[in-house]
Amino acid sequence: MTMIDLIISKLEREHLTALAELEKICFSTQAWSYKSLEEELTNPTAYFFTALVGGEVAGYIGMYVVCENCYVTNVAVFPQYRRQGIARALIKMAMLTADAMETDFISLEVRPSNTAAIALYKSFGFEQNGLRKNYYKNPNEDALIMTKFFKRE
């Protein structure tokens, strides 16, 4: 794998158009709109990070921190940037943020057919601890709930 010029930054307004396009590519009918993404800029419980490669938006991750709980809402990488460690860097940023905020856990949903994502999450210590029936559409699919618990003293 070649080295890439990767920067993980806080979501900025100038990233929204690219993220709305990425949402359509990755999530089609369940994609978040530009307006939905824009609302997260002022949501006090939302933490969204953008992956930039050479100044271009390559992907992003979004999460909510509520009390001592962290929920990942979205992880997406443009197809041309996949298999380059970008999703790994985004997950790592989310985990570092959640841990620094002393959350008890970080949780997410994933399609059972998304074996690459499942393997990535497992490599960070996430374990399946639930199932949401008929969660995804086009195609219809359940969602695996995966959680990583943080050890607190």
Regions found by a protein language model. Give the residues of each.
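Conserved glycine-rich acetyl-CoA-binding loop
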Residues: 56, 74, 78-92, 101-105, ...
